[in-house]
Design a protein with these regions (language model features):
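N-terminal glycine/serine-rich phosphate-binding loop of ATP-dependent small-molecule kinases
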Residues: 1-91, 116, 120
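Glycine-rich phosphate-binding loop and adjoining helix at the ATP-binding site
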Residues: 81-131
Length: 131
């Protein structure tokens, strides 16, 4: 019984199948599009990422149909909203590289009482990196 690792990164989805001694049996990878809008926004099509994941898992499951565990990692600060009823994405994922929230961060930075409170509670300064 082996293991499967899934990494949904900024540029692709990668699945690695390991044997029981953690030796790599096979690596599968599929890139997804980076959507750069004229406004400078950065997004990902969640349906494309989902379809890539399904297709890669089909390939991986031919090598390991009953893994002991599956590990998952993702892009961290990228975020998405899903419809509670349908489970479908409401919009593309907002990628960590996107700066659409920077004007709000600037407002916070220019207000020391709010800015200091955020830094005190989080240890971080307001930054669009954190979506």
């Amino acid at each position: 019984m082996g293991y499967i690792s899934i990494d949904s990164s900024t540029s692709s989805t990668t699945i690695i199948v390991f044997d029981e001694k953690l030796k790599i049996k096979k690596k599968f990878q599929k890139e997804h599009k980076q959507i750069f809008t004229p406004e400078g926004y950065v997004e990902h099509d969640l349906n494309e990422i989902y379809q890539n994941l399904i297709n890669l898992m089909r390939l991986a499951s031919q090598l390991e149909s009953n893994p002991k565990f599956i590990s998952l990692t993702n892009q961290r600060e990228t975020f998405a909203l899903f419809d509670k009823e349908t489970g479908r994405p409401v919009h593309n994922a907002i990628v960590w590289q996107c700066t659409r929230g920077q004007k709000y961060c600037d407002e916070i930075i220019n207000n020391p009482s709010i800015s200091n409170r955020i830094t005190q509670k989080t240890g971080l300064k307001a930054n669009s990196f954190f979506s």
